[in-house]
Structure formats: structure tokens, C-alpha cells
Curated annotation (Swiss-Prot):
Membrane topology: Single-pass membrane protein
InterPro entries hit by this protein: ATP_synth_b/b'su_bac/chlpt, ATP_synthase_B_chain
Description of how the protein assembles with itself and partners: F-type ATPases have 2 components, F(1) - the catalytic core - and F(0) - the membrane proton channel. F(1) has five subunits: alpha(3), beta(3), gamma(1), delta(1), epsilon(1). F(0) has three main subunits: a(1), b(2) and c(10-14). The alpha and beta chains form an alternating ring which encloses part of the gamma chain. F(1) is attached to F(0) by a central stalk formed by the gamma and epsilon chains, while a peripheral stalk is formed by the delta and b chains.
Presence of keyword RNA-binding: no
Xref: NCBIfam families: PRK13455.1
Location in or out of the cell: Cell inner membrane
One GO term describing the cellular component: plasma membrane
Protein's name according to its UniProt entry: ATP synthase subunit b
Organism expressing this protein natively: Ruegeria pomeroyi (strain ATCC 700808 / DSM 15171 / DSS-3)
């Protein structure tokens, strides 16, 4: 401390002796000279600061502050790196999920297309079956109508023939026909 105090004191004294204030006023080394008193007070203040090691305390505090800032920076750097790795991981997962979603959508579209085609084929087959059933019903109804018409025509023809035969045939001819029918039936049965 004395090593620093002596050169500082000598510099202050030289600066004080060479100052223009000394040339303008009376003797510099007098307690009546305010410049001298201020200089002495300043030197005493500096000496007290050095005696109580205030510069080293300030330096230590600044060093601690610098270390704290450096540790904060290191922690922030680590957090930033972790955040970047998490971001990269999430981006990879998002790309994977997007790929899976695209694949699911493509599969669903493909399945929907196949289902639509199958439904179309099934609908065409159903229409063909219904058309065939309708045609069968029409043919059956037509056949039934034709049979009904034939049966009525036969019944009308038999009734008309019976009327014609009954009106034109005599009782002897009718008995002769009945006997021939019985004989014919008997021959066919035996």
C-alpha cells in the first residue's frame, strides 16, 4: 500500500506545484489555500479507500458479478442448445406424424375408392337381379294370363260343343257314344 501511496502523493504534489492556481494565489502549501486542502482531502480519501481495500472489494464484487453473468450465459447457452435439440426432435416427430397422417389419408381414400367401386358393382348386380325377377314375374303373369285365357276358351268351347252336340244329337246316338266311351275306357284300364 505504501508502494502505491508514495508515487500517487508525489504526482499530486508535482501537479499541485505546477498548477496555475499556485501561480495565481499565495503559497500553495497553506491551509488557507482551498486547492491544497481539497488535494489533501482527496489524497486522504484515496488512502482510506486503499487502506480498507475498497478497490479489491470492488474488483472482487465485479469479478463475482462477471462470474455470475458468465454462469448465467453458460446456463442460457445450455438451455438454448436443449431448446434447439427439443425443437429439432419435435420437428422430426411432426414430420413423422405428418407422413403417417398422409399415409392414413391415402389408405382411407384408396379404401373409399374400393368401397365405392364395390358398391357400384353390388348395385349393378342388385339391379340386374331385380330386373330379372321383374321379368320373371312379368313372364309368369303373362303365362298365367295366357293359361287363364286358354282355360276359359276351352271351357267356353266345351260348353258350346256340349250345346251343339246336345241340340244336334238324338238319344240313341248319345247312348251309343256313352257305350263306346265305356268300352274304350275299360280297354285302356286293363
Amino acid at each position: 500500500m505504501r508502494n502505491i501511496l508514495a508515487p500517487v502523493l508525489s504526482l499530486v504534489l508535482i501537479a499541485g506545484v505546477a498548477s496555475p492556481a499556485l501561480a495565481a494565489s499565495g503559497p500553495f502549501f497553506s491551509l488557507k489555500n482551498t486547492d491544497f486542502v481539497v488535494t489533501i482531502a482527496f489524497l486522504v480519501f484515496i488512502a482510506v479507500l486503499f487502506y480498507f481495500k475498497v478497490p479489491s472489494m470492488i474488483g472482487g464484487a465485479l469479478d463475482k458479478r462477471a462470474e455470475g453473468i458468465q454462469s448465467d450465459l453458460d446456463e442460457a447457452r445450455k438451455l438454448r442448445e436443449e431448446a434447439q435439440s427439443l425443437l429439432a426432435s419435435f420437428e422430426r416427430k411432426q414430420k413423422e406424424m405428418q407422413g403417417q397422417a398422409d399415409a392414413i389419408v391415402a389408405a382411407a381414400k384408396e379404401e373409399a375408392q374400393r368401397s365405392a367401386e364395390q358398391a357400384k358393382v353390388d348395385l349393378e348386380a342388385s339391379i340386374a337381379r331385380r330386373l330379372a325377377a321383374a321379368q320373371d314375374q312379368i313372364a309368369s303373369a303373362e303365362a298365367a294370363a295366357v293359361k287363364d285365357v286358354r282355360d276359359r276358351a276351352i271351357a267356353i268351347a266345351v260348353a258350346a260343343a256340349g250345346d251343339v252336340i246336345a241340340s244336334s244329337m238324338t238319344a240313341a246316338e248319345a247312348n251309343k257314344l256313352i257305350d263306346a266311351g265305356i268300352a274304350d275306357a275299360g280297354a285302356k284300364l286293363h
